[in-house]
Amino acid sequence: MSVKNAMTAEFLRSAYGGESMAHMRYLGWADKADKEGFPKIGRLFRAVAYAEQVHATNHFVVLNGDVADTALTAGAVFGMKETAENLVGGIMGEEHEVEQMYPVYYEAAKFQGEKDAMRTFHFALQAEKQHAELFRAARECALAKKD
C-alpha cells in the first residue's frame, strides 16, 4: 500500500502519532487505575490501548512506512491524574477523533481517491465512538467508587 497525495499522507502521519501516543498514555493510566483499586478500569484502558496500537499500525501500513524525517505531535491530554480525571482525558481525546479529526481525514482521503486511507480512517472512527462510550461508563463507576 502507498499514498499518492501529500495531504492524505500528512493526515495518516498525524493519526499514527496520535494513536501511538494514546496507546502509551492509556497503558500508564491502566497502571494508575490498578493502584487506585479499579482493576476493571485498568483492563479497559489496556484493551483500548491495544486498539489504539492497531489503529496506529493500520495507518503505518497504509503509509508503507513513509514516516521518515517527519516530526509527529498530538494535541492530546498529557499527564497522570486520578482515574476519573484520566477517563475525562480519554473521553476528550476520543470525542476529538470522532467529531473532528477522523471525519475530516476521511473526507480528504475520499476526495483524493485514497481508498486504503479511507478504510483505515473509517475503521478507527467507528472504534473511537465505542471507546468514548466505554470511558463514559467507566467514569461513572470511578466517581461512584465502583469498579
Q: What do these predicted regions represent?
A:
Residues M1-D147:
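Non-heme di-metal
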